[in-house]
């Protein structure tokens, strides 16, 4: 029969259990069971960093810092400066100076022009569009100056009848300018509406006269064509003045066809292109190429070759995109001329 004895203990965070057995013959056997307590074992375990590290030795060569402070160290406290207009600086080219007459804060009644009068309608009718627009903006600037001065006088509760009278005279001139411009606009619309019924006979008459001019007088013939395109189709010789619309595109096609008809008897290639076009240019891209060519046989022949190449490649401008495409062509042409200049 065996006798068992159990002993337990704890040493350095390790729990130990001893079991001793003695059999009938007196032989003693012992088993040791150990269980580590992990919570206390990890805390009490010795490591290589248990002792603090010694401080590093002081270095003899140390680079000085590149910046000692973020602030200036030579600041001085001075007496406060009282606010005054003399202490303020303003750019003399500032746009807001346009609201001041000669840089003055306010004009007195004696400094205003009390001897002027408004422009009359007959006087304005004799002025050009540029003169009317220049006069309009001069009046607008004067009214802005007067409006600022009258506003200040109302705030100071001062009388400003002289300013109000001058403002009324300038205002009268402005509405008369608008009246004259309205008259011209209506005259243009009525003339254009009347021309719509007489345009076909007029174009046939000018076309016959243009083609009948001798070859030696090409300059006079194309001067006639330039007046026609300006009066009927609104096509100006200056690119920036053109407004691309349906009338403009139709004018390009008509002028391009007339140029081909004038030079067709002098060159077989131009005549062949005119016959292939069934008597007229209908594509806006082709018309633009011929229209922008110089009024000489060599340039028109070169334009005809370019049109034939476009047709071989199948490049055509859709009718619904003609206005936008021609406007883009004009913009590129204007940019090219600016670069060349």
Curated annotation (Swiss-Prot):
<dbReference type="GO" id="GO:0003735">
    <property type="term" value="F:structural constituent of ribosome"/>
</dbReference>
<keyword id="KW-0687">Ribonucleoprotein</keyword>
<feature type="region of interest" description="Disordered">
    <location>
        <begin position="44"/>
        <end position="74"/>
    </location>
</feature>
<comment type="subunit">
    <text>Component of the mitochondrial large ribosomal subunit. Mature mitochondrial ribosomes consist of a small (37S) and a large (54S) subunit. The 37S subunit contains at least 33 different proteins and 1 molecule of RNA (15S). The 54S subunit contains at least 45 different proteins and 1 molecule of RNA (21S).</text>
</comment>
<feature type="compositionally biased region" description="Basic residues">
    <location>
        <begin position="48"/>
        <end position="62"/>
    </location>
</feature>
<dbReference type="InterPro" id="IPR038340">
    <property type="entry name" value="MRP-L47_sf"/>
</dbReference>
<dbReference type="GO" id="GO:0032543">
    <property type="term" value="P:mitochondrial translation"/>
</dbReference>
<comment type="similarity">
    <text>Belongs to the universal ribosomal protein uL29 family.</text>
</comment>
<keyword id="KW-0496">Mitochondrion</keyword>
<protein>
    <recommendedName>
        <fullName>Large ribosomal subunit protein uL29m</fullName>
    </recommendedName>
</protein>
<dbReference type="Pfam" id="PF06984">
    <property type="entry name" value="MRP-L47"/>
</dbReference>
<keyword id="KW-0809">Transit peptide</keyword>
<dbReference type="InterPro" id="IPR010729">
    <property type="entry name" value="Ribosomal_uL29_mit"/>
</dbReference>
<dbReference type="GO" id="GO:0005762">
    <property type="term" value="C:mitochondrial large ribosomal subunit"/>
</dbReference>
<keyword id="KW-0689">Ribosomal protein</keyword>
């Amino acid at each position: 029969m065996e006798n068992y004895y159990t002993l337990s203990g704890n040493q350095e965070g390790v729990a130990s259990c001893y079991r001793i057995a003695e059999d009938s013959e007196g032989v003693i056997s012992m088993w040791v069971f150990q269980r580590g307590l992990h919570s206390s074992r990890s805390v009490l375990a010795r490591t290589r960093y248990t002792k603090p590290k010694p401080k590093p030795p002081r270095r003899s060569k140390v680079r000085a810092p590149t910046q000692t402070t973020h602030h200036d160290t030579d600041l001085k406290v001075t007496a406060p400066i009282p606010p005054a207009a003399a202490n303020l600086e303003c750019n003399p080219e500032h746009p807001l100076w346009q609201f001041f007459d000669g840089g003055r804060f306010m004009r007195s009644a004696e400094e205003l022009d009390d001897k002027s009068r408004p422009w009359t309608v007959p006087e304005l009718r004799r002025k050009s569009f540029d003169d009317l627009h220049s006069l309009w903006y001069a009046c607008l600037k004067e009214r802005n100056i007067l409006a600022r001065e009258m506003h200040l006088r109302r705030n100071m509760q001062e009388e400003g009848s002289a300013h109000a009278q001058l403002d009324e005279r300038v205002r009268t001139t402005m509405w008369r300018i608008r009246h004259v411009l309205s008259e011209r606009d209506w005259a243009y619309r009525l003339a254009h509406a009347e021309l719509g019924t007489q345009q076909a006979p007029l174009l046939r008459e000018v076309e016959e006269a243009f083609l009948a001019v001798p070859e030696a007088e090409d300059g006079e013939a194309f001067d006639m064509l330039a007046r026609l395109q300006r009066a009927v189709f609104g096509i100006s010789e200056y690119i920036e003045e053109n407004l691309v619309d349906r009338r403009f595109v139709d004018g390009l096609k008509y002028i391009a066809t007339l140029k081909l008809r004038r030079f067709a008897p002098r060159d077989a290639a131009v005549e062949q292109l005119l016959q292939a076009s069934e008597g007229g240019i209908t594509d806006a891209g082709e018309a633009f190429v011929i229209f922008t060519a110089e009024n000489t046989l060599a340039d028109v022949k070169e334009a005809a070759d370019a049109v034939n190449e476009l047709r071989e490649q199948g490049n055509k401008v859709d009718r619904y995109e003609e206005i936008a495409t021609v406007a883009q062509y004009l913009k590129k042409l204007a940019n090219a001329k600016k670069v060349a200049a």
